[in-house]
């Protein structure tokens, strides 16, 4: 296990951070494709279309070809939301990390090992938190595939916890998709609670929609105070 350190983001980290973020998002595409295939509406669609071709044209070969191209199309479509998200982030908060995070009452950290950036996480104040709450939102938690299983992700989340606690925040919140099961497992193991769920990432609105889960971690002292 190679040693690592967590430090605040510096401008020289930019290319490595963006590369790690982009690769991490693309890793979710196979899981998104598998998730898509198991949806009832997808299975129905894959059954009805070839059956229609057999009934209309009487050709099983044409039906098999249809299934092949439908699967190929679904594979391409499954990756589009993640590609769009990366493109959006690179035009917004990730375009200038210093301005978006460090100069906006938040912060951004990297995990460094062997001179390379192997993990990232950011935190920003929530603009309109619930009444009586002061919340920080966690963004862009990512760890290089070669450095997972070393506790880096947990250490990065704890770094956000410490920063938020020191700044007087009552909660840390975040959002992630149902596709990212390893992230969901991590957050729940660290004490985050599911506080909401909504559908946002749509491949084809009438066919496939990925749900977004909202998580909240409330600091124990805050919970005791409310009691």
From Swiss-Prot:
GO BP: determination of left/right symmetry; gastrulation with mouth forming second; heart development; negative regulation of cell adhesion
- Keyword Membrane belongs to the record: yes
Q: Which Gene3D superfamilies match?
A: 3.40.630.30
GO MF term list: N-acetyltransferase activity
Q: Which SUPFAM superfamilies match?
A: Acyl-CoA N-acyltransferases (Nat)
Q: Which InterPro entries match?
A: Acyl_CoA_acyltransferase, GNAT_dom, NAT_camello-type
Q: Transmembrane region positions?
A: 29-49, 53-73, 201-221
- Chain's role: May play a role in regulation of gastrulation.
The protein's name = Probable N-acetyltransferase family 8 member 5
Classification from the root reads: Eukaryota, Metazoa, Chordata, Craniata, Vertebrata
| Encoding gene, per UniProt annotation | Nat8f5
């Amino acid at each position: 296990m190679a040693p690592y350190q967590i430090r605040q983001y510096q401008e020289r980290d930019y290319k490595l951070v963006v590369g790690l973020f982009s690769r991490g998002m693309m890793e979710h595409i196979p899981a998104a494709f598998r998730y898509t295939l198991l949806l009832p509406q997808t299975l129905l669609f894959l059954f009805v279309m070839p059956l229609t071709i057999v009934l209309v044209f009487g050709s099983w070969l044409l039906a098999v070809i249809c299934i092949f191209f439908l699967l190929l199309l679904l594979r391409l479509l499954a990756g589009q939301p993640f590609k769009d998200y990366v493109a959006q982030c690179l035009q917004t908060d990730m375009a200038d990390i210093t301005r978006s995070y460090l100069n906006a009452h938040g912060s951004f950290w990297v995990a460094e090992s062997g001179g390379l950036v192997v993990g990232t996480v950011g935190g920003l104040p929530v603009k309109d938190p619930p009444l009586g709450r002061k919340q920080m939102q966690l963004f862009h938690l990512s760890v290089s595939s070669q450095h997972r299983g070393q506790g880096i992700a947990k250490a990065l989340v704890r770094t956000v916890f410490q920063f938020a606690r020191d700044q007087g925040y009552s909660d840390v919140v975040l959002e992630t998709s149902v596709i990212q099961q390893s992230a969901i497992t991590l957050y729940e193991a660290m004490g985050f609670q599911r506080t909401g769920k909504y559908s946002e990432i749509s491949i084809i609105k009438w066919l496939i929609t990925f749900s977004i889960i909202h998580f909240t971690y409330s600091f124990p002292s805050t919970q005791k105070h409310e009691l």
